[in-house]
Curated annotation (Swiss-Prot):
PANTHER family: GLUCOSE INHIBITED DIVISION PROTEIN A, PROTEIN MTO1 HOMOLOG, MITOCHONDRIAL. Pfam families: GIDA, GIDA_C_1st, SAM_GIDA_C. NAD-binding protein involved in the addition of a carboxymethylaminomethyl (cmnm) group at the wobble position (U34) of certain tRNAs, forming tRNA-cmnm(5)s(2)U34. Its main location: cytoplasm. Homodimer. Heterotetramer of two MnmE and two MnmG subunits. GO terms for biological process: tRNA methylation; tRNA wobble uridine modification. The gene is mnmG. GO terms for molecular function: flavin adenine dinucleotide binding. InterPro entries: FAD/NAD-bd_sf, GIDA_C_N, MnmG, MnmG-rel, MnmG-rel_CS, MnmG_C, MnmG_C_subdom, MnmG_C_subdom_sf. This is tRNA uridine 5-carboxymethylaminomethyl modification enzyme MnmG. Keywords: Cytoplasm, FAD, Flavoprotein, NAD, tRNA processing.
Length: 630
């Protein structure tokens, strides 16, 4: 193919999924001339698997993206068809919002946002090779021969990277949802010294909603109480006309159909070689691994208002199509369901994430960034968070500003990226609340208090929104201070209230804040006995109640975070020679050499690096010379 010089951009983003959309929008909004290149303009921010966003940990990531000035939260608030707050019976650290998306409206709305964003050009094309000179990425070449030069390139090719779809005995080269795969880009990465591995994910069948007998299933409606992903969205915009999801179950017949055909299941015949996601196994994998379970939950989720397609959740499979028909028809409510699309597995290339810096710039090629499923993660939310960070850091580097890195105590996005670049991953990485050491600080409700100031400093949060944030922050602080000054006396009314709640009576006067700390006392109860603040926002009330009730636990986490910050402040010289440091264990030395951690705290989280290694390294850094260990 004859090449030609097409154009120059400050930033080129390859791939317009959830990572690419956020990366391109961030770079453009920070004033960089940006090209967003996608294989198919009709698949911008598409949802090839579950038509939903959020859930435990992942929902908090969407809030963090919004607090930093990203688009995902605003986009889903405009296009959801159901909203539910999960884990409401548990503590605030694990509460999470989940939205059922109209996947087609989500795509259209995000595409329109991209098309109307200043400094951002959206174009269809297939990137086939990187332009690399002296270890520095200078642009890309497309399949039509167009040479686009750039100061930074961000790759977000997702599961299209040398993608291969598998349905039973059938295998063929493809990206997600039967899109065009990206083959030569993977080859270009390998030619430039990158180590790639193969992962696998899957998706369930889609069925025709008009052929489902919903009377045999359990309805799951949305919440009536307003909730939103974006801090910009007012409660008045909350959708009242929500669509329900539905729940049914597999049974003995389903399990027998699967067991009888395991000899045709790619998961067990060796056809699938890529490593699959631990926390989203296929239904055939679940039947084998959990043989004692009599049934498994199945969720029937609408894919939008203008379609009858239903996503059969928790039923991912790569069984042959004819077997998928039998599996579906064995399930209550789906006896006569017509399958519109079969489930499939897809294998794809992943850049081993130890080759990345915390900014998501690669260590192998300068000015080249990767984000999303290319880095070994699963999920739209994890991809979007990485894309946002890659776009921000590409823009910052070009303008000579310091890199933007969130640490583990600041955001789930920080936990995600630190896990990737420090520990790597041997399977598709899913963000879980259990991965965060400071999850009481990383809540759904306080993402704006954690990150809005940072988003404003980056230029991604405008002044009007920042002013609204400061008003909320001041209101929270004022109410917390007020409750520390008001005293309640053991009046007959208060004692009767406490008795009705099963709480111990007051013996003496007590501060309003201490009264609120009682497990059965809500803020709404408290203001029966003290003057109410007129017009106080319910989000302020939520914040006050959580901060008061969990003050002791929050203070403990703050103390741990202060210790972490001290370790993060101990920078490791970029040119350090680990071979020159006597006393390091062999495994620790090898891991440190491979990962090249930037701080002592990051080094301490590397698997195989023991506390003694950290002690030796700490002495070396402090003394600035080789640590002698007897």
């Amino acid at each position: 193919m004859r090449e030609y010089d097409a154009a120059h951009y400050d930033v080129i983003v390859v791939g317009a999924g959830h990572a690419g959309s956020e990366a391109a929008l961030a770079a453009a909004r920070m004033g960089r001339e940006t090209l967003l290149l996608t294989i198919n303009l009709d698949m911008v921010a598409f949802m090839p698997c579950n038509p939903s966003l959020g859930g435990p940990a992942k929902g908090i990531v969407v809030r963090e993206i919004d607090a930093l000035g990203g688009q995902m939260g605003r986009n889903i608030d405009k296009t959801y068809i159901q909203m539910r707050m999960l884990n409401t019976g548990k503590g605030p650290a694990v509460r999470a919002l989940r939205a059922q998306a109209d996947k087609h409206a989500y795509h259209r709305t995000m595409k329109r946002t991209i098309e109307t964003t200043e400094h951002l050009t959206l174009r269809q094309g297939i990137a086939e090779s990187l332009i690399v000179e002296d270890g520095v990425c200078k642009g890309i070449v497309t399949n039509t021969g167009a040479r686009y030069s750039a100061d930074s390139v961000i790759l977000t090719a997702g599961t299209a990277s040398r993608g291969k779809i598998i349905i039973g005995e059938l295998t063929y080269s493809s990206g997600p949802n039967n899109s065009i795969p990206s083959i030569k880009l993977s080859e270009s990465l390998e030619d430039n010294g990158f180590v790639l591995t193969r992962f696998k994910t899957g998706t369930p069948p889609r069925v025709d909603g008009t052929t489902i007998d919903f009377s045999k299933t359990e309805e799951q409606p949305g919440d009536k109480e307003p909730n939103h992903f974006s801090f910009e969205t007012p409660d008045s915009a909350y959708l009242k006309d929500q669509l329900s999801c539905w729940m049914t179950y597999t049974n003995d017949t389903t399990h027998q159909v699967i067991r009888d055909n395991l000899d045709r299941a790619p998961m067990f015949t060796g056809v699938i070689e890529g490593v699959g996601p631990r926390y989203c196994p296929s239904i055939e994998d679940k039947i084998v691994r959990f043989a004692d379970k009599p049934r498994h939950q199945i969720f029937l989720e609408p894919e939008g208002r203008e379609t009858e397609e239903y996503y059969v959740g928790d039923f991912s499979t790569s069984m042959p199509e004819e077997i998928q028909h039998k599996m579906i028809h064995s399930i209550e409510g789906l006896e006569n369901a017509q399958m519109m699309r079969p489930g499939y597995a897809i294998e794809y290339d992943v850049v081993e994430p130890w080759q990345l810096k915390p900014t998501l710039e690669t260590k192998v090629v300068e000015n080249l960034y990767t984000a999303g499923q290319m880095n070994g993660t699963s999920g739209y939310e994890e991809a979007a968070g990485q894309g946002l960070m890659a776009g921000i850091n590409a823009a910052l580097k070009q303008t000579g500003r310091d890199p933007f890195i969130l640490d583990r105590s600041e955001a789930y996005i920080g936990v995600l990226i630190d896990d990737l670049v420090t520990k790597g991953t041997k399977e598709p990485y899913r963000l879980l609340t259990s991965r965060a050491e400071y999850r009481l600080m990383l809540r759904h409700d306080n993402a704006d208090l954690r990150l809005t100031e940072k988003g404003h400093e980056l230029g991604l949060i405008n002044d009007d929104r920042f002013d609204s944030y400061e008003v909320k922050k001041a209101a929270v602080e004022a109410e917390l201070a007020r409750l520390e000054k008001i005293r309640l006396k053991p009046t007959p009314e208060i004692q009767a209230f406490l008795a009705a709640k099963g709480e111990a009576p007051l013996k003496d006067g007590v501060l309003a804040s201490d009264f609120l700390k009682r497990p059965e006392v809500k803020y709404a109860d408290l203001i029966q006995f003290i003057p109410a603040v007129e017009g106080i926002d319910n989000r302020v009330v939520e914040q006050v109640e959580i901060q008061v009730k969990y003050a002791g636990y929050i203070d403990k986490e703050k103390a741990k975070i202060a210790k972490l910050k001290r370790m993060e402040a101990k920078k490791i010289p970029a040119n350090i020679d680990y071979d020159a440091i006597e006393g390091l264990a062999t495994e620790g030395r090898q891991k440190l050499q491979k990962i090249q951690p930037e701080t002592l705290a990051q080094a301490s989280r590397i698997g195989g690096v023991n506390p003694a290694d950290i002690g030796i390294l700490s002495v070396y850094i402090q003394q600035g010379k080789i640590a002698k260990v007897k």
